[in-house]
């Protein structure tokens, strides 16, 4: 059984805990029944001993598999990780979604995507990452009475993502503690209006509108102060062809959306200026979770 889940970029500027999209950078898990339990990790996290001893995927997988079949069995797990850890690209959501999907698949029980999404909400209470991880594409998602309500829009191949990945991780939990408990009404209105406009821009494919619609006054500046060069990065990206330039999740990755014709030029400019950072040109992913026999 092979399970794969895409990377995600959430918040997208003003859409705090609400907006997210999927990127064509996947974590893959291969699972086989075995006489012995074993874990093999390739790619991101391969040298992290803690991931083998205290593995979130295994914990969630065993919890759901046991509920479905009434016992635990031994499996050989091979993880091929392409999503950087703790960089704001949804690595935790990918683990959660793939673990639940894998448990149901190995138990031989079909699970609708909507149900899987709501089970994932138990471990990740903010739907902006888990929703595109499951559904693919651009998603607007809210939680009401512990249930996710979401709408998806596929993203055309004429657009590309240029992501800039610093060599420094940022903890989402720690990042949240830096945010204020209260916000000015004018700033809240600013964000509500722009997140609404950004959603409309995606669904109507009015990409030029994103330059205005992706602005934020609630969280990005506070989070970016921990890595001040991100302010320069954002300004440079918007000058050199990005339609929007936003902190990806809580960071440290910066997400830039542009037309395909601008992607290589934008990536080169950013790589030349921020030589110590990884710069990747990525397609958008419209499939989300994939399960293969």
UniProtKB/Swiss-Prot annotation:
Keywords: Amino-acid biosynthesis, ATP-binding, Cytoplasm, Kinase, Nucleotide-binding, Threonine biosynthesis, Transferase. One of its GO terms (biological process) is threonine biosynthetic process. ATP binds at residues 84-94. Pathway: Amino-acid biosynthesis; L-threonine biosynthesis; L-threonine from L-aspartate: step 4/5. One of its GO terms (cellular component) is cytoplasm. Its EC number is 2.7.1.39. The keyword tRNA processing does not apply. It catalyses: L-homoserine + ATP = O-phospho-L-homoserine + ADP + H(+). Its main location: cytoplasm. GO terms for molecular function: ATP binding; homoserine kinase activity. Catalyzes the ATP-dependent phosphorylation of L-homoserine to L-homoserine phosphate. Belongs to the GHMP kinase family. Homoserine kinase subfamily. PANTHER family: HOMOSERINE KINASE (PTHR20861:SF1), HOMOSERINE/4-DIPHOSPHOCYTIDYL-2-C-METHYL-D-ERYTHRITOL KINASE (PTHR20861). NCBIfam families: thrB. This is Homoserine kinase. It comes from Nitratiruptor sp. (strain SB155-2). The lineage of its organism: Bacteria, Pseudomonadati, Campylobacterota, Epsilonproteobacteria, Nautiliales.
